[in-house]
């Protein structure tokens, strides 16, 4: 989600380009990193071509066989249409990249709905939909 705080000239040399001129999908390449889910027992191996941090908990819940919250179920469905999303943009299931504020995207309303849910989860102190974001405690 962020880069080390190094001099801009370092990135310019590394990329053979001016980092300030990178946009969209080119800028996205700077944030691409592999991930691994490790278990001390056999689990189904899977190669995930493209994902984002917001979906890692859905993969973990699936591998561990943990019951998902409504929110994790929502994210699981969302990742079918939009397998990767972040502050710069997102990819659809066909591999097409969209800038995050692209109002002509067929996914614009879906992204807007996701942003509202994220806001409610993070900042909705009085009106947070707790039953959606958390599992009920077992007695």
Residue positions per predicted region:
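Solvent-exposed soluble domains appended to multi-pass membrane proteins
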Residues: 2-139
């Amino acid at each position: 989600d962020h880069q080390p705080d190094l001099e801009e000239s370092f990135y310019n040399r590394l990329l053979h380009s001016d980092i300030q001129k990178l946009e969209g999908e080119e800028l996205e390449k700077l944030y691409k990193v592999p991930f691994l889910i490790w278990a001390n027992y056999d689990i189904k191996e899977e190669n995930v071509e493209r994902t984002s941090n917001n979906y890692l908990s859905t993969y973990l819940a699936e591998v561990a066989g943990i019951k998902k919250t409504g929110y994790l179920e929502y994210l699981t469905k969302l990742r079918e249409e939009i397998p990767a999303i972040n502050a710069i943009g997102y990819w659809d299931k066909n591999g097409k990249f969209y800038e995050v504020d692209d109002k002509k995207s067929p996914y614009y309303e879906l992204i807007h709905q996701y942003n509202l849910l994220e806001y409610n989860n993070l900042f909705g102190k009085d009106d947070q939909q707790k039953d959606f974001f958390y599992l009920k405690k077992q007695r």
